[in-house]
Amino acid sequence: MSVSAFNRRWAAVILEALTRHGVRHICIAPGSRSTPLTLAAAENSAFIHHTHFDERGLGHLALGLAKVSKQPVAVIVTSGTAVANLYPALIEAGLTGEKLILLTADRPPELIDCGANQAIRQPGMFASHPTHSISLPRPTQDISARWLVSTIDHALGTLHAGGVHINCPFAEPLYGEMDDTGLSWQQRLGDWWQDDKPWLREAPRLESEKQRDWFFWRQKRGVVVAGRMSAEEGKKVALWAQTLGWPLIGDVLSQTGQPLPCADLWLGNAKATSELQQAQIVVQLGSSLTGKRLLQWQASCEPEEYWIVDDIEGRLDPAHHRGRRLIANIADWLELHPAEKRQPWCIEIPRLAEQAMQAVIARRDAFGEAQLAHRISDYLPEQGQLFVGNSLVVRLIDALSQLPAGYPVYSNRGASGIDGLLSTAAGVQRASGKPTLAIVGDLSALYDLNALALLRQVSAPLVLIVVNNNGGQIFSLLPTPKSERERFYLMPQNVHFEHAAAMFELKYHRPQNWQELETALADAWRTPTTTVIEMVVNDTDGAQTLQQLLAQVSHL
């Protein structure tokens, strides 16, 4: 009997089972213990293969692929700390709903806790973060292929969002020629190999039903809060709110067109919050709200009913309102709850939104990050998409810009970490094939610098704007101790990215004004390559501009 041959047959069943659940993209890191999984994936023509040498970046690449494809994406890594590097991407997927399938190779049980090399306790290492965790046994013909495939099917068939961890121990030898070992074991699955359906099919999840009193609530004074959603959902939500005559507070990730722009500015005005107090119902569609003033208002508002609609399960309301948690696809929910044409009830807020935008426009000429955030809608590629980093940049875009309705916007706003942002952007571009504008800060770029290797392989133009404000200037907005702020919070690195771009043979520009930036962008959109544009700005200008605008708008 050939151990290596049966390892590969066992792995082939696992990989084939994944294809029955929509897995097309598979991300592979180098490793020896994962050889059976890697070779099985390589031999399966249903997969699009992606590789990367850094498992943390690989997990985020898969996250980006899953964001766009809306399908589960598989990841293969070897044993040891390689597995632990997948933790950040798994956590993010659990909070934002992408489906990741982590296939982690492992040493067999007799090599654990005895000093064997690269052998750690992998079963259960991700605690409660996966939706399902499976610790497979060592491959053996004593366990039927039916058990193996139905175990995989059960986990994936009930997966609605988040990750599945499948731990796969393999004994040596891992290499060798294929022979007939395990062929009859594999063939007991019969014509399943020629089929395209799962061996075990789970019943679909039940979603929230139509709210029978909707006809009553839609006649009341309501507010729509739009969080993270798809581009198509964003357009539908905007029309729905407009028909109802309800004010729409749109997050940067809502893709609604933000008909009342600069919400995180005007929500700091007492006239706005006073008018919003008249709302009898708030309907929040989508989660992961960004703006600080929006979150403060959301926490303090007291409508008669607060409804949250999202297809991600869980509470999704840190303010714990009295109301309804409705688990449903947003577009489907809107169809079940049609709008009735009514006149807008808010008078003051549209005026404040217009005045706030005019205040922002009055400051747009200076070459800085706040101004870039406002101008970003002018720089979006046609038929393209935007990927926004975390910390200060996403808050500035949320507060100061007005993105087009239905224009795809992606970000990692679940756990809101700055790790893996470039890798996620690479996955977003690969899955869509669209021109992509990605914007991150300098520390975020440094954190995921080796992901520039992934950006060498793009199918359409990708522009990475690195806003270099020399450190974590988000902390300039917080009451951090002034004497310790630079050393322990901002951590300026005093670096530039020209040589990093050169190391990975990427185009690079460092514009000094808007004309140079626009020229660099126009050139970048002409060729299907990656261009790094480093925008060096004064350290605290972005944070100070936001604070000044907040003060100005609060007194309108």
UniProtKB/Swiss-Prot annotation:
- The source's domain of life comes to Bacteria
Q: Name the NCBIfam families on file.
A: menD
Q: Which family does it belong to?
A: Belongs to the TPP enzyme family. MenD subfamily.
Its taxonomic path starts at: Bacteria, Pseudomonadati, Pseudomonadota, Gammaproteobacteria, Enterobacterales
Record-linked PANTHER family? 2-SUCCINYL-5-ENOLPYRUVYL-6-HYDROXY-3-CYCLOHEXENE-1-CARBOXYLATE SYNTHASE, PROTEIN PHYLLO, CHLOROPLASTIC
Give the enzyme's main class according to its UniProt record, as a single word: transferase
- The protein here is known as 2-succinyl-5-enolpyruvyl-6-hydroxy-3-cyclohexene-1-carboxylate synthase
UniProt keyword terms in alphabetical order: Magnesium, Manganese, Menaquinone biosynthesis, Metal-binding, Thiamine pyrophosphate, Transferase
Q: Name one Pfam family in it.
A: TPP_enzyme_M_2
Q: What is the organism field in this record?
A: Escherichia fergusonii (strain ATCC 35469 / DSM 13698 / CCUG 18766 / IAM 14443 / JCM 21226 / LMG 7866 / NBRC 102419 / NCTC 12128 / CDC 0568-73)
Asked whether the UniProt record includes Manganese among its keywords, one would answer yes
The note describing how and how many cofactors are bound reads: Binds 1 thiamine pyrophosphate per subunit.
